[in-house]
């Protein structure tokens, strides 16, 4: 029996990512992006905006993220797409509509295109909760990037582009720790 699990044995220079960032609540999304970039960089990805491995796309808010993610996925140029945003509950039902449609839209992009699309949109009740998840206590941007790395590796294996790693030399993604979380 073959076991497939995302690993980091693939040459990182062959991977390409797109990061779609909602500008609304940029106090939060800027921090998520920094965590994302830190993780990718530590795993050998060139995060320079003028480089060839990561493309950055800014959109007005989380509602617009799925449309742009779909267009990027359809290009076939990316091993994974990371979607970042922050939706903070207010006093109207607007939060519920935006959060639900962003989640459904991002999931649909992955299903329709076969490209891994990471849901990195925070949905919180308060700005404080969002900031805690974007850097005060931990930075979930790191986790979203790690998810993208794992899924890019896993989908590569499932597509037959990369053979599963049976050696003990590499650490499976499930055993990696996020250095940005204070325990």
UniProtKB/Swiss-Prot annotation:
The active site is at 94 (proton donor). Its EC number is 2.5.1.78. One of its GO terms (cellular component) is riboflavin synthase complex. GO terms for molecular function: 6,7-dimethyl-8-ribityllumazine synthase activity. Pathway: Cofactor biosynthesis; riboflavin biosynthesis; riboflavin from 2-hydroxy-3-oxobutyl phosphate and 5-amino-6-(D-ribitylamino)uracil: step 1/2. InterPro entries: LS, LS/RS, LS/RS_sf. 5-amino-6-(D-ribitylamino)uracil binds at residues 24, 62-64, 86-88, 119. It comes from the Bacteria. One of its GO terms (biological process) is riboflavin biosynthetic process. Keywords: Riboflavin biosynthesis, Transferase. (2S)-2-hydroxy-3-oxobutyl phosphate binds at residue 133. It catalyses: (2S)-2-hydroxy-3-oxobutyl phosphate + 5-amino-6-(D-ribitylamino)uracil = 6,7-dimethyl-8-(1-D-ribityl)lumazine + phosphate + 2 H2O + H(+). Gene3D superfamilies: Lumazine/riboflavin synthase. NCBIfam families: lumazine-synth (TIGR00114). Belongs to the DMRL synthase family. Catalyzes the formation of 6,7-dimethyl-8-ribityllumazine by condensation of 5-amino-6-(D-ribitylamino)uracil with 3,4-dihydroxy-2-butanone 4-phosphate. This is the penultimate step in the biosynthesis of riboflavin. This is 6,7-dimethyl-8-ribityllumazine synthase. It comes from Crocosphaera subtropica (strain ATCC 51142 / BH68) (Cyanothece sp. (strain ATCC 51142)). The gene is ribH.
């Amino acid at each position: 029996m073959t076991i497939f699990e995302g690993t980091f044995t693939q040459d990182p220079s062959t991977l390409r990512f797109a990061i779609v960032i909602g500008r609304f609540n940029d106090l939060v999304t800027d921090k998520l992006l920094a965590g994302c970039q830190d993780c990718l960089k530590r795993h050998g990805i060139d995060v320079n905006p003028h480089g060839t491995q990561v493309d950055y796309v800014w959109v007005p808010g989380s509602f617009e993220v799925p449309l742009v993610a779909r267009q990027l996925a359809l290009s076939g140029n990316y091993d994974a797409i990371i979607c970042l945003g922050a939706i903070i509950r207010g006093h109207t039902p607007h939060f519920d509509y935006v959060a639900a449609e962003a989640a459904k839209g991002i999931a649909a992009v992955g299903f329709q295109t076969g490209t891994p699309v990471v849901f990195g949109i925070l949905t919180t009740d308060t700005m404080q909760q969002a900031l805690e998840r974007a850097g005060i206590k931990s930075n979930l941007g790191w986790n979203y990037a790690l998810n993208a790395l794992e899924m890019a590796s896993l989908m590569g294996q499932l597509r037959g582009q990369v053979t599963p790693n049976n050696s003990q030399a590499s650490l499976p993604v499930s055993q990696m720790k996020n250095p940005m979380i204070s325990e």
